[in-house]
């Protein structure tokens, strides 16, 4: 039986050329799989037909936007996930979602190899292959760009020689990856870390310096899940999409950072994630109101490790699954409403309310009606500081 390869297919030049390139290099039949995680662009059926026209023996497309939002973005919101305290894991979250469909297709079509279009220099090669090995331990992985030296110039020449039905126009100077949770821009003039980003690179966000009216929004959560915006019920996908539009119009969610890549180098990355930043900001503030102090403190440590695991491509690891359980439990009481003002590049929380709130007005107030018994404070301080006091006496001897 002829060997079969499942290819992660985008519909673009590189993966279209990869269909024939893989067939020539390996003699295998190629099955193209395109997964829609909200990246926009062409209709899925157009992409499917192009894959077949480029030589794929079969082509599958999957509308995974809701799945991506519910199963991948939502856990990140509950985890307040920001790698290096800034990056909301835009690309890292989409890779395991795509991998799940690739492995399922490989099993369905009895393929022994899964291929992707990553280079040998980035994080994504690890994310794809670590995920594939976790879900399909017997599957082999190949990357034509990395393994067969499929450069851009060679891809264009191959495309023209084979008369493939895809344009070979000049490539953008930037490397761009996008989905419903955000957009990543790198390379080109951004590789000089002194160069400021220009407005032309942004699509999800407007210039925050442009004058416009502020936008007030109320986001409602139930056990950490965004369930309504301004009182109107939403799915997780709808919440992200609506806040992408509203927060993006205010220039919220732009991130420019030098990032520690998994492969050991530092890389300059520019991100746009208006919906993600608005939702994480609101969720984190509601946690401040509803989550007990020691649980909240420990959750911050868990959040950091969770984000590192996802960034590093270990979505399917035992530790990540265990941390998921902790985060889910920590979100049980995260129910209520957060009011925010979206304006000039910032999402500012202006109001909080929750039936599960741990904020006690009578204990917190300094006005008449204060129920906090201040007479107990001195004894508490004496006990709390006792070990430090004993150590200080010793050190003075």
Swiss-Prot record:
Pfam families: Arginosuc_syn_C, Arginosuc_synth
Quaternary structure and interacting proteins, as annotated: Homotetramer.
GO BP terms: argininosuccinate metabolic process; L-arginine biosynthetic process; urea cycle
PANTHER family, A to Z: ARGININOSUCCINATE SYNTHASE
UniProt organism field: Streptomyces clavuligerus
Keywords linked to the UniProt accession: Amino-acid biosynthesis, Arginine biosynthesis, ATP-binding, Cytoplasm, Ligase, Nucleotide-binding
Regions that span the bilayer: none
Molecular functions per Gene Ontology: argininosuccinate synthase activity; ATP binding
Keyword Cell membrane attributed: no
Protein name (Swiss-Prot/TrEMBL): Argininosuccinate synthase
PROSITE patterns (UniProt xref): ARGININOSUCCIN_SYN_1, ARGININOSUCCIN_SYN_2
Gene: argG
Binding site for L-aspartate: 119, 123-124
Catalytic activity, reaction form: L-citrulline + L-aspartate + ATP = 2-(N(omega)-L-arginino)succinate + AMP + diphosphate + H(+)
Entry keyword annotation includes Transcription regulation: no
Cellular component, GO, one term: cytoplasm
């Amino acid at each position: 039986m002829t060997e079969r390869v499942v290819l992660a297919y985008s519909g673009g030049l590189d993966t279209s050329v990869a269909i024939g390139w893989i067939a020539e290099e390996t003699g295998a039949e190629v099955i193209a799989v395109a997964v829609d995680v909200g990246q926009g662009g062409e209709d899925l059926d157009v992409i499917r037909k192009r894959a077949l026209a480029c030589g794929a023996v079969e082509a599958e497309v999957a509308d995974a936007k809701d799945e991506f939002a519910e199963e991948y973005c939502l856990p990140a919101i509950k985890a307040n996930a920001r790698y290096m305290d800034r990056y909301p894991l835009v690309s890292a979250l989409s890779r395991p979602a795509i991998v799940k469909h690739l492995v399922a297709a490989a099993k369905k079509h009895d393929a022994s190899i899964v291929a992707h279009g990553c280079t040998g220099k980035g994080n994504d090669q690890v994310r794809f292959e670590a995920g594939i090995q976790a879900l399909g331990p017997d599957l082999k992985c190949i990357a034509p760009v990395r393994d067969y030296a499929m450069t851009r110039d060679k891809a264009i020449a191959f495309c023209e020689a084979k008369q493939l039905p895809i344009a070979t126009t000049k490539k953008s100077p930037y490397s761009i990856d996008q989905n419903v949770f955000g957009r990543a821009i790198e390379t080109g003039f951004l590789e000089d870390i002194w160069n400021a980003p220009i407005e032309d690179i942004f699509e999800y966000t407007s210039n925050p310096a442009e004058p416009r009216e502020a936008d007030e929004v109320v986001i409602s959560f139930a056990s950490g899940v965004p369930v309504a915006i301004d009182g109107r019920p939403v799915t997780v996908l709808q919440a992200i999409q609506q806040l992408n539009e509203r927060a993006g119009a205010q220039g919220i969610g732009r991130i420019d950072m030098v990032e520690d890549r998994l492969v050991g180098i530092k890389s300059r990355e520019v991100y746009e994630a208006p919906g993600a930043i608005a939702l994480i900001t609101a969720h984190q503030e509601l946690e401040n109101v509803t989550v007990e102090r020691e649980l909240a403190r420990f959750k911050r440590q868990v959040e950091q490790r969770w984000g590192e695991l996802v960034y590093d491509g270990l979505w399917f690891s035992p530790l990540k699954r265990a941390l998921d359980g902790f985060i889910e439990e920590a979100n049980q009481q995260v129910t209520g409403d957060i009011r925010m003002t979206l304006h000039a590049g910032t999402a500012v929380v202006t109001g909080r309310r929750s039936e599960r709130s741990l904020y006690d007005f009578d204990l917190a107030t300094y006005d008449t009606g204060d129920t906090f018994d201040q007479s107990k404070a001195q004894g508490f301080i004496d006990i709390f500081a006792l070990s430090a006091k004993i150590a200080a006496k010793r050190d003075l001897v």
